[in-house]
Amino acid sequence: MAKNPNNLIIRHQDEVAKERSACGHRYRLLSQGDNDVAAWAHAVDIDGAKTHYHKISTELYYVLEGEGKVLLDGEEQEVRPGTMVHIPPGVVHGAVGKMRVLVVGIPDID
């Protein structure tokens, strides 16, 4: 990871541990541990994400690889590479299928 006095962060997924999460396996590319960061970003290998919601965080999913469906308040939506999904606070969401997704949360996860 490269970090400088201006709080610029450059990080490759090989520099962070692969972790199990409710959505599959994730790589925390940007998260709470980074000073002065107002959001988080994870590369997630989704393999059946359990439904959940966030009280104050908005999430953005950008599908990088694979195909599947996201569940948004009980409604299924098909997604494929190039699809962006905006998930406002309070929306119960999850995913089915095998896909790699860039997930960004604003503000940091609650």
Q: Model regions: which residues?
A:
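Short acidic-glycine-tyrosine-enriched beta hairpin
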Residues: G74-P89
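A short glycine-rich, His/Asp/Glu-containing loop-to-beta-strand
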Residues: V16-T51, V104-I109
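Histidine-centered catalytic micro-motifs
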Residues: K50-I56, V91
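Short, conserved beta-strand element in jelly-roll/cupin
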Residues: A43-D45, H54-V70
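Catalytic-core "active-site belt" of small-molecule-metabolizing enzymes
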Residues: A2-R20
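Structural motif
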Residues: L60, E67-K69, E76, V92, ...
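Ligand-binding loop in jelly-roll beta-barrel domains
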Residues: P89-D110
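A generic fold-level signal
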Residues: A22, D34-D36, K55, V79, ...
